[in-house]
Amino acid sequence: MEVCGGHTHAIYRHGLPELLPPMIELVHGPGCPVCVLPMGRIDDGLALAEQPNVIFAAFGDMMRVPGRKGTPLEYQARGADVRMVYSPLDALKLAQANPQKHVVFFAIGFETTAPSTALTLMRAKQLGIRNFSVFCNHVLIVPAIRAILDSPDMRLDGFIGPGHVSTVIGCRPYLFVARDYGKPLVVSGFEPLDLLQAILMILRQLREGRAEVENQYRRVVPWNGNPAALKAMAEVFELRPYFEWRGLGFISQSAFKIAPAYADWDAEVRFDIPGIRVTDPKAAQCGEVLKGVLKPPQCKLFGRECTPEHPIGALMVSNEGACAAYYHYVHRLSATRSA
C-alpha cells in the first residue's frame, strides 16, 4: 500500500502499474486529507461561512468538496464571503486587511501542513490579531496506518511510507509497523525511480524474511524529523481523544486540536459549532477505496455519476484522491484508446 495520495498520483501519472509483474499489486491508502474528512466536518466549517461578518478562508482543493448543502464555491455564489488562500499566513493577512471582519481559516492536512498552521497561530498571538481563528482539521498519519493494520480486511504485505509527512515526523514513528505487525515499510520519494526502488526494497525484505523501516528518501527525510516543526506543533496543538475519518470511522488520538493557550484563536471555542454527523451518499464507496478494499473503477459510480466535473465523493474532488488520479491517468486514456 502506498499511504500517500501524492504517491498514488505519481504511480498513475508515470504508468508504473504497467511496468510491474502481475503478482505485485499497489493498493491506495488514506493519505489524502481532503478525502478522509467526513462530510459533517465540512458542514461544520460551512456553517461558519454563513455567519455574519465572517470571511471563510480555505485551500483550493477544499473549494469543490461537497457538504450537504453544496461546496464552498457554491456557498460563495450564494453570497457567503469565501476566499481561496495558498497558506494560513494568507488568511492571517486577510484578517489584518479586514479588521471589521472575522477570518476563519479551515485548516486541513496531515503533519505536512500542520507546522504552517502552528506558526501562523503563534504569529497571530504575537501580533495580538483577534479577528482571526482556525477551524482545525489536521489529522495524523500514524494512527491511520495502525487502524488499517488492525482492520479485518487487511491483506497487505508492506507499505510505501509517505514522503512529505516524513519530512516533518521522520521515520521513527513507523517502527511499530515492523515491530508489532511484522510488515516492512519504506519511506519513498515521488520520482518514478524513487517508487520503483522503494518497491524493490520492500520485495527484498519479504524475500529475506525481514520486516524493517527503511528510508529510500534520505536526500530529503531525516530519520528523526524536523525538530523546529515538531516543536511548533507541540506548543500549539494537543491530541483529540478521537476523530472521525471517512471510511475508517472514529480513531483515537488521530487528530490535532488547538491547545488551551491558543483558545482565543480556536474557531471551535469562538463559535458555536453544530457538530454535524452525516453519512456519505449510499451509492458512493469512498470508504472501501480508502481502506484499499476496492480499486477506484470498482465503485459503482466511478466514471458515470461521479467524475471530476461532477464529483459525488471526496476521492474524486481532491488532487490527491485515488479516484481522481485513476480517472485522469488511466480511465480517460483507456477511453481515448478505445475510441
What is the role of each PLM region?
Residues 1-100, 114, 118, 122-127, ...:
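Metallocofactor- and cofactor-centric catalytic cores in central/energy metabolism, strongly enriched
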Residues 59, 85, 106, 135-137, ...:
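Generic beta-sheet signal
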Residues 127-130, 209:
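Secondary-structure transition/capping motifs at alpha-helix termini
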Residues 135, 153-222:
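A conserved active-site cap/scaffold subdomain adjacent to cofactor or substrate pockets
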Residues 196-288:
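Internal helical hairpin/lid segments
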